[in-house]
Structure formats: structure tokens, C-alpha cells
A protein has these predicted regions:
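Bacterial N-terminal signal peptides that target proteins for export
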Residues: 1-12
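C-terminal motif of bacterial Sec signal peptides marking the signal peptidase cleavage site
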Residues: 18-21
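Acidic, Gly/Ser/Thr-rich repeat motifs that build Ca2+-stabilized beta-propeller blades
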Residues: 23-207, 261-264, 269-280, 327-363, ...
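Surface-exposed loop and turn segments in beta-propeller and other repeat-based domains
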Residues: 114-126, 170-184, 228-252, 297-327
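Beta-propeller blade signature
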Residues: 155-163, 215-228, 286-288
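Short, conserved, GDST-rich strand-edge loop motifs in beta-rich repeat architectures
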Residues: 198-220, 281-287
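Short acidic/glycine-rich loop or secondary-structure boundary segments that cap or lie
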Residues: 272, 280-285, 293-298, 306-311, ...
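Conserved blade-ending motifs and adjacent loop-strand segments that build the rim/top face
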Residues: 368-388
């Protein structure tokens, strides 16, 4: 998840930083079968699959205007848990929340606070490890979980869902070795075509000592794209590096340091990726699924919009927005707000920073993108989510789940 000199003492106490010299080599990935490229299900801008899509599609493309008046906002506490880190919403509106230690609970619904999954005996919270992300499959009967196992390696598996409960044995989706206990990444999201995306950090250590960010032979520092429909685990045949002998076929995009977090905005058909920087810049990337394939987000040749280890790589996709260090130090990516309670925010990407906790929204200022402060601050935010109504949830490592509301 994190790193920063200015918060070393605090974050070490939370198990969120591990710095180590790198003396290891990357393992080659295990080959996966290839499946025909999945067809888009038609859910995108203007799709009937989102009850707000008609509204959104009628707006001009892009973010809301920066001169829009914003209301006074505040954060109300929903519940206190143990290091909540991610959420997902089931078909019936039940909200599940993942705790970093390995439990998935019902946040609200018929039986609030009920534990539906407990993998705490199979993971560890050393360094930046733990249960990192959850996502319900588009077909509704599987809960996908991204975590590090007891050895610290990345593990993605799918648990069969029966209503809001877990029934049966999980199926293994993907594993890869993690050389160190930081820069694990771990966010998972589904695209409209049913493919699963997994964001992975560069393997750890300052300055990308493994060279993973620009090394297509490893899934580290990359976004993995898999076809996991109908019980299969395969590489889609349109993955960009499938025919490249020295590349991992599952890699869809490269050049990431530590993606924290990813979100797919279904009405606009856009993937948002927040990538934690080294010591100068924090960045936010926005691409369509088509633009994702073969994208190079720059690390470690670039850090945000500035050079780091070399020249700008071929095919570089620069960030939509980046910012320097000051009050902030380590971005916590959010999502595009699609709720009804705060229409002034609708269509804006809300995010924060682990160090200063100020919630911000990306908005359009002419040809430029700017971040406006929302006037509300949380403490050490490590994730965002939504409730069943699409209202924004803020997750603090200290345990609080907060909802963004109008004053």
C-alpha cells in the first residue's frame, strides 16, 4: 500500500511500511490457457444496466466543471470495524466490507456485521500485506478476493455466493510471488466484458530495484487481465502481449509502481487507476478498456509527469492528474461519484491522500483538470466504496467506515 519518510514512525506501527534492499530475482509467470476475446455485454455509456446512465450520457464528456458550486459536506460514522479496506455491493443491495486482517462482513443488509468469509488464518498483515480487495462477479454468484497468502504472495480466488453467504470451496484464480512485503497493489475490478483486472505493484523497494515496471516478462508493476467466466481461468485472446515471446501473456498494461486503488465507472466506460509515487509525484490515470490494452503508465522511467530513471517510454500514457508532495505523500484512489444525495459531485472522481486525509474531487477547468478540496478530512484513509444507493463510503485504517453527506 504505502511508503513515505514523513510518516515512517506512524505507519511502521501500523505495519504499513517495509523497506528492504533487493537481492532477489523475479520468477517467470506460470503459462495460462488462452480463451477467445470476450464480447462487451453492451453495458457502457447510456446502458440500461445503470439507472443513472441516461443522465450521464446526456452530459458533455468529461468531468464536472470546476466552477460548479459545491455544498457544505461532512462525514458521518456508519460503523467501526478492524482496518476496513474495500467494499462491494451484491445484487440485492447488501454491502460487504473487507477487513485487512482477512474477514469479510455484511456492512448493511438483513444481518449487519455478520462475518460471511474469514481467511484470517491464511494471510498476514506484515508490511502491506493482508486481504486487499473484494469484488462480486457480474454474474452475481461468486465473490472474488485478492489477498496475500501466509507466505506473502499474491492470491486471487473466487468464493461461491449463496445470497449474502459463502457456500462451498473457492476456486483458485491467480497467484504470483511477491519478493517483499510492500508494493503489493492488489485491487481487483471487473470490466463490462466480464474480464477481471488485477493491479500489482512493482514488487517493493525504493526506485524499482527489480526493474519490474518496464519488464513485460513479469506481472509485477502491471495490470493483469483474465477471463474468469463460466468457471474458466484463461488469458483473453486480445491481450496485447499474447504473441510476444518474452512477455507474460496475462499482462494488459505496464508501468505502475503501486496501484492503490482502481475503479471502473460503468456509465462512462472508464477505468481509473491511482498510482502511489516515489518521493515527488502522486498520479491518477484514466483509460477506456480499449486504451488499457498495451498502455505503459511510465514507472520507473517516469514518476507522474516528471522523469525518474530515464526517457519517456514508447506508448507512454501520461496521468490525467498528478500532484506533488507537501501535506500529501501517498495517494488513496477513490471512485467516480454516482449517488443522488450530492448531485453537484456527480461525475467527479473523489480521492484523498493517506497523509493529509483531505477529500478532493477532480473537475474540469477549461482544458485542464483540477482537484478541488471538499472541505472534509478523514484520518489515514486506505479505501473508498459505496453503499447500495451509490453514496460514498470512506474507509480509515483505524477502523471507521464513514459516509459522505450534505450538511
Amino acid at each position: 500500500m504505502r511508503r513515505r519518510t514523513s510518516m515512517v514512525v506512524t505507519l511502521l506501527a501500523s505495519g504499513l511500511i517495509l523497506a528492504a534492499a533487493c537481492t532477489t530475482e523475479l520468477d517467470p509467470p506460470t503459462p495460462l490457457p488462452v480463451a477467445p476475446a470476450p464480447a462487451d455485454d453492451g453495458a457502457g455509456p447510456g446502458s440500461e444496466d445503470d439507472d443513472r446512465a441516461d443522465d450521464v450520457a446526456s452530459e458533455a464528456p468529461g468531468l464536472p466543471p470546476a466552477d460548479r458550486d459545491l455544498p457544505r459536506l461532512s462525514l458521518e460514522e456508519v460503523v467501526t470495524l478492524e482496518a476496513p479496506i474495500d467494499t462491494t455491493v451484491l445484487e440485492d443491495g447488501t454491502v460487504l466490507v473487507a477487513e485487512r486482517a482477512g474477514r469479510v462482513r455484511v456492512l448493511d443488509g438483513p444481518t449487519p456485521d455478520r462475518i460471511v468469509l474469514d481467511v484470517s488464518g491464511r494471510t498476514t498483515t506484515d508490511g502491506e500485506r493482508g486481504l486487499l480487495s473484494i469484488a462480486v462477479a457480474p454474474w452475481g454468484d461468486e465473490l472474488f478476493v485478492s489477498m496475500t497468502d501466509a507466505d506473502g504472495d499474491t492470491l486471487v480466488e473466487a468464493h461461491p455466493l449463496d445470497g449474502a453467504g459463502i457456500e462451498g470451496t473457492p476456486r483458485s484464480i491467480y497467484t504470483t510471488r511477491q519478493p517483499f512485503a510492500n508494493h503489493n497493489g492488489g485491487p481487483i475490478v471487473f470490466l463490462p466484458d466480464g474480464t477481471l483486472l488485477l493491479g500489482l505493484g512493482d514488487g517493493g523497494g525504493a526506485g524499482d530495484p527489480l526493474g519490474a515496471g518496464q519488464d513485460l516478462s513479469t506481472p509485477l508493476g502491471a495490470i493483469v487481465r483474465l477471463d474468469v467466466r463460466d468457471g474458466r481461468v484463461a488469458v483473453p485472446s486480445d491481450n496485447p502481449f499474447l504473441e510476444q515471446a518474452d512477455a507474460a501473456a496475462e499482462v494488459a498494461a505496464s508501468g505502475l509502481r503501486n496501484p492503490w486503488r482502481m475503479a471502473f465507472d460503468r456509465p462512462r466506460g472508464e477505468l481509473w487507476i491511482a498510482d502511489v509515487g516515489q518521493s515527488e509525484r502522486e498520479e491518477i490515470n484514466r483509460v477506456t478498456p480499449a486504451q488499457l490494452l498495451g498502455a505503459n503508465f511510465g514507472w520507473a522511467l517516469r514518476e507522474g509527469t516528471v522523469p525518474f530513471l530515464g526517457e519517456e517510454p514508447d506508448g507512454h500514457v501520461p496521468p490525467l492528474h498528478d500532484y506533488g508532495h507537501g501535506p500529501g505523500c501517498s495517494i488513496t484512489g477513490g471512485l467516480v461519484y454516482r449517488g443522488d444525495a450530492i448531485p453537484e459531485l456527480r461525475g467527479g472522481y473523489v480521492f484523498t491522500d493517506l497523509c493529509d486525509g483531505e477529500l478532493r474531487v477532480l473537475m474540469q477547468d477549461g482544458a485542464d483538470v483540477t482537484a478541488r478540496e471538499l472541505g472534509v478530512t478523514a484520518t489515514r484513509v486506505i479505501g473508498f466504496g459505496t453503499d447500495a444507493d451509490g453514496e460514498l463510503l470512506v474507509l480509515e485504517i483505524g477502523g471507521r467506515v464513514l459516509r459522505l453527506v450534505r450538511d
